């Protein structure tokens, strides 16, 4: 019997090419995301192919919150701003103001009225005056860079439309069971078989774009002698936001299999100032030392990911909250941020540019492990590093293990270092 999610998926997913052909033909496809993310399936159809009959089908089998994913440029041209200035949604779902068609509709909520607004959103000749807000339909703004920047259903939808040569407007809604609980993969696949709908994982779109798109550019390289030995340092610039990232390479890694890799998020307080609140500086030092000892490997240093993506100022505010009894998870949530908002597409592209395909990843973080796999890299082994508990970081580390699922295997408290 097939039991694991990976086995179930691989036995039932169709090719990306088949899904693209179905979209061109006006058919539905289903995109499922990672189990570590929303773990849901969205029913998707091209905006320009929508009909009242197909909208009715969407409404009957989903939450009823039907959305249209469009590029940010298109939404700007239609004068549709974000719904809120401070997006506190767990996955930063990029809603704009809700809309109805300005003319030719009744209440705006019927299948016919929603079809009308989708047709307008998909029509490149539509203008801002063709819409009114608030309404009953929810446009979503796809991130520049698509699934390589954010591996969500919004970006998957727009990327699929562009790959199919259609207008960059797709309709999507989340599949639910008859009791309105969310469909998970087994139920999604059963539904797809019943209605003859193609199912693909978001990872298939990511893998395709990883091979066809280039979102980082190497701008300089040099020899870098360090206290751990000689490395070659490469500076990469993201073509998405202009941030410059680093790759420290030990030995000849191009084309090699099972290369030792550490993808490290910038932490000024831990990496530079020696903060005892976190284990970031120790992880960085241990990883560089271990790579140097093995003689071959890569350390990717991702800038702009301070405090699991919330920025230095907010991270220090989180420290103050922790001093008043919050743990690292609740501190982020109290400030309106996700527990961990980092994405790893740029890091993956740097590794691919270094001609890596299979890696041994130095990490305790399941989100990083699965995130890098989702970006087209094959992880053949996870390499843990020793974790040292101190009085200052004990609660932080235990929270990462108990509430964030990190694979730390913490020793008991009497192994605490001073």
From Swiss-Prot:
Nucleus keyword on record: no
Region (GTP cyclohydrolase II): 212-418
EC number(s) reported in the record: 4.1.99.12, 3.5.4.25
Cofactor: Mg(2+); Mn(2+); Zn(2+)
Catalytic activity annotation: D-ribulose 5-phosphate = (2S)-2-hydroxy-3-oxobutyl phosphate + formate + H(+); GTP + 4 H2O = 2,5-diamino-6-hydroxy-4-(5-phosphoribosylamino)-pyrimidine + formate + 2 phosphate + 3 H(+)
Active site location: 340, 342
Residues reported to bind Mg(2+) 1: 38
Family statement: In the N-terminal section; belongs to the DHBP synthase family.
Function noted in UniProt: Catalyzes the conversion of D-ribulose 5-phosphate to formate and 3,4-dihydroxy-2-butanone 4-phosphate. Catalyzes the conversion of GTP to 2,5-diamino-6-ribosylamino-4(3H)-pyrimidinone 5'-phosphate (DARP), formate and pyrophosphate.
Name of the protein this chain belongs to: Riboflavin biosynthesis protein RibBA
Lineage: Bacteria, Pseudomonadati, Chlamydiota, Chlamydiia, Chlamydiales
Gene designation per UniProt: ribBA
């Amino acid at each position: 019997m097939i039991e694991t999610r990976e086995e179930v998926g691989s036995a039932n997913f169709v090719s990306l090419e088949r899904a693209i052909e179905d979209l061109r033909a006006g058919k539905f496809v289903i995109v499922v995301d990672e189990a570590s993310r929303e773990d849901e399936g969205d029913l998707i159809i091209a905006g320009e192919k929508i009909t009242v009959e197909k909208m009715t089908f969407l409404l009957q089998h989903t939450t009823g919150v039907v959305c249209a994913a469009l590029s940010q440029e298109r939404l700007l041209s239609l004068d549709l701003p974000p719904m809120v200035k401070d997006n506190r949604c767990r996955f930063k779902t990029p809603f704009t103001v809700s809309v109805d068609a300005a003319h030719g509709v009744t209440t705006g909520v019927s299948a016919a009225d929603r079809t009308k607004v989708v047709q307008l959103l998909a029509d490149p000749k539509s203008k801002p005056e063709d819409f009114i807000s608030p309404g009953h339909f929810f446009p979503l703004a796809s991130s520049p860079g698509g699934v390589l920047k954010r591996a969500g259903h919004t970006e998957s939808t727009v990327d699929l439309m562009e790959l199919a040569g259609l207008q960059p407007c797709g309709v999507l809604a989340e599949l639910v069971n008859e009791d309105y609980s969310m469909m998970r993969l087994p139920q999604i696949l059963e539904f797809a078989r019943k209605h003859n709908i193609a199912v693909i994982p978001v990872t298939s779109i990511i893998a395709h774009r990883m091979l066809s798109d280039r979102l980082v550019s190497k701008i300089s390289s040099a020899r870098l002698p360090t206290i751990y030995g000689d490395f070659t340092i490469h500076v990469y610039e993201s073509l998405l936001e202009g941030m410059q990232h680093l790759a420290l390479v030990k030995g000849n890694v191009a084309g090699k299999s099972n290369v030792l890799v550490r993808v490290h998020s910038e932490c000024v307080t831990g990496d530079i100032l020696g903060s005892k609140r976190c284990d970031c500086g120790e992880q960085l030092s241990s990883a560089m030392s271990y790579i140097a000892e093995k003689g071959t490997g890569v350390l990717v240093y991702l800038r702009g990911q301070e405090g699991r993506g919330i920025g230095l100022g907010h991270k220090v505010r989180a420290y103050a909250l922790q001093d008043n009894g919050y743990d690292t998870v609740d501190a982020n949530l109290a400030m309106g941020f996700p527990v961990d908002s980092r994405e790893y597409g740029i890091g993956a592209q740097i590794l691919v540019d270094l001609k890596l395909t299979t890696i041994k990843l130095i990490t305790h973080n399941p989100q990083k492990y699965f995130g890098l796999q989702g970006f087209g890299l094959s992880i053949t082994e996870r390499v843990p590093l020793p974790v040292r508990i101190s009085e200052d970081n004990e609660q932080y580390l235990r929270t990462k293990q108990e509430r964030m699922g990190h694979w730390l295997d913490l020793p008991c408290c009497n192994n605490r270092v001073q």
